[in-house]
Amino acid sequence: MKPKVESYIYKSMSDIFINRIKCTKETIVEILDLFTLKSFVLEISNVQRSDVLYEKIKQFNLRYTTSLEDKSPYFDVALMSNKEQFKEIIDYIVDSDSETFAIINMGNRIQWEQFLYNKIPVRKLIKQGIIDINISVGLQESSISISLCNNIYNSKQIVTDIKTLFRDRRC
């Protein structure tokens, strides 16, 4: 079955949905490479304390914060990353029990640690100019959703580039 790409282009922002896709390291990196992101917030859900992923985050010396609650074996992790660091850690994310992760490009990197506790909807954050892109990957759902600011990205070109990536693939 071929991946399905849907796009909804609005005045100030766009939503792009990619379904029926294998969320492999290669696929995710190819999509990430469509954007010029220097550093970004990487939010990973449902990380276990004993997981290799958590150990690697600490080993790679990445700046991170958690939603750690004493009694829960699972927590969310937000960390500041760049593409090279992401390429090192993506294998551990895909192999972990994490169900979803998101890549968020924020204008004000000083406040990145607050992102984990910020429950404002992504669309509102884009409209307010706080973030310019959010790429959410549902590992178990085999889906990727991208919300982006039209003032910064050419959404029609991004959709064309995504369709070109998957034109001859069966996932």
Task: Go through the PLM ranges and name each one.
Residues 1-171:
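Structured alpha/beta or helical-core interaction and ligand-binding surfaces enriched in interleaved
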